[in-house]
């Protein structure tokens, strides 16, 4: 969901930068550490990107502190560029959504926020949304056929494929749709 249909990075950068430029930011201890570590009162994608060599620990901690329990944040994230086009293509297959929750410290607001986003933007019921960190466990359907996972992290698609599913590393909507079209015309389509 995040990085495929939803632009989590854009949403979280806007939220963090709004707080860092405020005279009284939420979680000021975390905000001050970000400003001290980066030497500026704003972050960029590289400061929070999961596998970026320039990732900031202070910015990442602030990100979790700000949004892990903010249901409104999760339910109002923007669409990923190309996300609507991708959804228009894949919805014909009646897909489920498989997404990782940000459930740090036992908080579940990201789950309810993501469910709201899915309902409002995709029109799906909660039964069509699955939350899991170990996405590979969903690689094969109950009837033994491989499922398809579209994810923006190879650390998710590779184990999914190794477990018998079809993992598609999402780079952009056009590329993912092309891969799906090839699968549809091959014997590998579920």
Where are these regions (language model features)?
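Short amphipathic alpha-helix with an adjacent loop that forms part of the alpha/beta core around
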Residues: 138-143, 179-189
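A structural signal for well-ordered alpha-helical scaffolds and beta->alpha junctions
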Residues: 5, 9, 80-83, 108-115, ...
